C-alpha cells in the first residue's frame, strides 16, 4: 500500500472555479509532513470581489506570479508522486481538472483521491467537518482560505485520522 499522500488546496479568483490563484501542497509520509509547497498563480482571469475578500489575493497580489502552466511544470512530478488528498476534494479536484483543461494540459492522477470530509464523516459522525471546525476540534492552527495553511491543516487532519481519529 502506498504511504505517500499529496495533500493540496487551491484558491480561485472567481465564481467560475476554472482557474487557480494560489496552491498549497503538503506531503505526508509515514504519518509526518515531510515537505510543503506554496505558490501564488496568475489566473489570467479577473478576480471577483468576494474571492479577493475571502483569500486576500487580487490582481496586484499575483502581478509577478507565474501562470498555471509554469507552476504545473514544477509541481506535476510532486502531484503524481502519491495519493491526492484534499478537504472537500470534489471542489479542489474539480478546479484542478478545469484548470488543466483550460490550458489543454493532459493529466490524470494515477489513483483515486481521498477526501478528508468524507473520511471524517465516517470516523467522527455527528460533528461538523468544515475545515475550521476540524482544526478547532484537533487544536490545529489555521489561517483559513490561505492555500498553504489549508493544505497543512488538511495534512494534520489526515494524520490524526490515520492515527485512529
List the predicted regions and their residue ranges.
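Short leucine-rich amphipathic alpha-helical surface patches
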Residues: 120-124, 139, 162
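Short secondary-structure boundary/hinge segments and terminal tails
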Residues: 70, 118, 151-153
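Conserved non-catalytic scaffold segment of RNase H-like nuclease domains
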Residues: 1-111, 125-145
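Buried hydrophobic packing segments
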Residues: 96, 119, 154-158
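Conserved beta-strand -> loop -> alpha-helix junction used to position metal-binding or nucleic-acid-contacting
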Residues: 108-120
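Acidic two-metal-ion nuclease catalytic site recognized across multiple nuclease folds
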Residues: 1-3, 155-165
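A charged, well-structured terminal subsegment
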Residues: 144-160
